[in-house]
């Protein structure tokens, strides 16, 4: 019974008038909100995107934390980006770090511990009226590393599958080659044995199988028959003729000494003497026979 009364009292509390109800406090935005974006086209059509109104537009997004010091300044009717007041406060705050009107605005969420001591936390940017949360460096690095590892592992997997396919193809090719060779050799030897069974002589095969006695005997050295190439002979003759033409003519023979008669002249005179019937004494060669007076005595 007590529980029913408590539930009834609770129902009366939440089902009362809207003016009597207390709105629940807004939850602070989460740390990772990179998967969402915010855009209010009605506000963009009503107000310009500049330094004076851009913070009011950012305060409409779910990225805005109502517990920040900028909200306290707004309630005091002070510009929420006034650095002279923000530097005197401690806690969470938003700072406009970069602005390129009207396309790009960059806000930084930071924690202030003193006038000159701040700790950056998150970064947001407004691009052409759409608000986004910038990813943290560690998240970007982890995503890039995971993507790289995935691509490398996929490349190795594809390469391994292709190598396996190539290996299987090579095995099939080798088996086919071995089978074809075995079939061809078998048919070849079968044909040879059939011819030999019929009494026909197979050139080289009968000697390889049956003529084993002659293998131990020394082979007789047969003179190699030299073949004469007529074209080669003509080419050598042409070369020798051209060389002979290029050489200078031989010098004339030296003159004979006085009283010397060559053997050719003596032969001619003897022939003439025999023909005339007169025998003449042979002339003495002065170089060969010089007489007893000019010979050396030993």
From Swiss-Prot:
GO biological process, one term: regulation of transcription by RNA polymerase II
Matching Pfam families: Med6 (PF04934)
GO CC, alphabetical: mediator complex
Keywords: Nucleus, Transcription, Transcription regulation
InterPro entries per UniProt: Mediator_Med6 (IPR007018), Mediator_Med6_sf (IPR038566)
Family statement drawn from the similarity comment of this UniProt entry: Belongs to the Mediator complex subunit 6 family.
Subunit: Component of the Mediator complex. Interacts with MED2.
Entry protein name: Mediator of RNA polymerase II transcription subunit 6
Originating organism: Arabidopsis thaliana (Mouse-ear cress)
Lineage per the UniProt record: Eukaryota, Viridiplantae, Streptophyta, Embryophyta, Tracheophyta
């Amino acid at each position: 019974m007590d529980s029913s009364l408590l539930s009834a009292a609770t129902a009366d509390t939440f089902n009362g008038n809207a003016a009597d109800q207390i709105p629940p406090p807004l939850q602070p935005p989460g740390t990772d909100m990179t998967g969402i974006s915010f855009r209010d086209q009605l506000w963009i059509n009503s107000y310009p995107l500049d330094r004076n109104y851009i913070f009011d537009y950012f305060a409409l997004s779910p990225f805005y934390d109502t517990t920040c010091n900028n909200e306290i300044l707004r309630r005091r009717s002070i510009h929420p980006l006034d650095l002279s007041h923000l530097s005197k406060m401690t806690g969470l705050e938003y700072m406009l770090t970069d602005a390129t009107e009207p396309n790009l605005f960059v806000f930084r969420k930071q924690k202030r511990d003193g006038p000159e001591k701040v700790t950056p936390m998150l970064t947001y940017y407004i691009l052409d009226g759409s608000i986004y949360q910038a990813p943290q460096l560690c998240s970007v690095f982890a995503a890039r590393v995971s993507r790289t590892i995935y691509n490398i592992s996929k490349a190795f997997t594809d390469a391994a599958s292709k190598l396996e396919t190539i290996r299987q193809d090579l095995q099939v090719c080798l088996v086919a080659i071995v089978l074809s060779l075995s079939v061809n050799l078998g048919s070849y030897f079968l044909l040879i044995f059939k011819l030999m069974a019929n009494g026909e002589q197979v050139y080289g095969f009968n000697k390889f199988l049956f003529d084993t006695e002659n293998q131990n005997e020394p082979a007789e050295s047969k003179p190699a028959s030299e073949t004469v190439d007529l074209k080669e002979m003509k080419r050598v003759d042409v070369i020798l003729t051209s060389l002979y033409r290029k050489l200078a003519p031989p010098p004339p023979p030296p003159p004979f000494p006085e009283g010397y008669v060559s053997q050719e002249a003596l032969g001619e005179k003897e022939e003439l003497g025999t023909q005339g019937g007169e025998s003449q004494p042979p002339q003495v060669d002065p170089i060969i026979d010089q007489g007893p007076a000019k010979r050396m005595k030993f």
